[in-house]
Amino acid sequence: GYQVDCVSYNYDNVNENLAQQFVDTQG
């Protein structure tokens, strides 16, 4: 999410959300 480009920013957010969900499911 560091890049100013909106597409990159959005993809970074999606990746971070998926990673957080994975951590949550792992307890």
UniProtKB/Swiss-Prot annotation:
Recorded superkingdom: Eukaryota
Q: Keywords on this record?
A: Secreted, Toxin
Q: What is this protein called?
A: Killer toxin KT395
Q: Where found, per UniProt?
A: Secreted
Instruction: State if Secreted is listed as a keyword.
Output: yes
Q: Which GO terms describe its cellular component?
A: extracellular region
GO molecular function terms listed in the Swiss-Prot or TrEMBL record: toxin activity
